């Protein structure tokens, strides 16, 4: 049974990635509005091997020693081979530069790496936890705190934050309640919007091209918050009505 499951999973992945053998962006809506960029993306995709395309979906986390960020296992080798799309927990200018130069100087296609970090309640300037901020109902201040965090994080080379957490929390036993905006879906939705706009520089995607903005990531999957018994990563059991009325709104 295990072999059959593995075969089916492998076949599904192969079928999905089979379409990657041809340039895939020609039919997409252009978010850049720059045809030269679109043509370059098409060109790079046509040059990539299947392994390199899969590698762009892989993210590895860096560890630290006294000299700065280090990569464990074969991650550094994979980075040099162009088989890493993003790195997590590299958060100094020197660390980012070291990893980026490695990718740009030694990989075949010189595709830059995307650097992500959990910028949850400030980067260098620390703000109250999101739950505490939400108690103020001050959306503008929450937008500004996210904008300040984006300004500081982007100066360190970070381009992507795993925030805001927009899970609705209704069980105080869950250990991640303080990362979100609490139990109210309406307030949670307004705060999610304010924080995303703060991180990304507004509600226009083009502001992501600014040097002082970062890509936001509303997390986690909807209905991750009502984990049974408050145990993180546990299952959730709820009706369709509860899902759509209480847990989905912040994601919409």
Enumerate the predicted regions with their spans.
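Sec-dependent signal peptide recognition
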Residues: 2-10
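Glycoside hydrolase catalytic-domain context in secreted enzymes
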Residues: 15-252
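N-terminal accessory segment at the very beginning of proteins
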Residues: 1-3, 23-24
């Amino acid at each position: 049974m295990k072999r059959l499951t593995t075969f089916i999973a492998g076949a599904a992945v192969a079928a999905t990635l089979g379409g990657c053998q041809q340039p895939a962006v020609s039919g997409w809506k252009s978010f850049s509005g720059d045809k030269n960029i679109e043509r370059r993306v098409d060109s790079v995709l046509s040059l990539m091997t299947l392994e390199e395309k899969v590698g762009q979906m892989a993210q590895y986390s860096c560890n630290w020693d006294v000299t700065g960020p280090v990569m464990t296992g074969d991650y550094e080798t994979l980075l040099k081979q162009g088989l890493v799309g993003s790195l997590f927990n590299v958060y100094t200018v020197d660390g980012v530069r070291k990893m980026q130069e490695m990718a740009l100087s030694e990989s075949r296609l010189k595709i830059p790496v995307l650097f992500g970090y959990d910028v949850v309640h400030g980067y260098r300037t620390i703000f109250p936890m999101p739950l505490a901020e939400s108690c103020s109902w001050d959306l503008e201040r929450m937008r500004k705190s996210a904008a300040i965090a984006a300004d500081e994080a982007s100066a360190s080379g970070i381009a992507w934050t795993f925030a805001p957490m927009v899970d609705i929390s209704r069980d105080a036993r869950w250990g991640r309640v303080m990362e979100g905006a609490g139990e109210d879906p309406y307030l949670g939705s307004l705060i999610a919007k304010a924080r995303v706009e703060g991180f990304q520089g507004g509600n226009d995607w083009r502001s992501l091209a600014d040097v002082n903005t970062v890509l936001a990531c509303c997390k986690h999957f909807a209905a991750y918050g009502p984990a049974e018994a408050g145990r993180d990563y546990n299952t959730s059991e709820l009706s369709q009505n509860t899902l759509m009325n209480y847990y989905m709104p912040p994601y919409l």
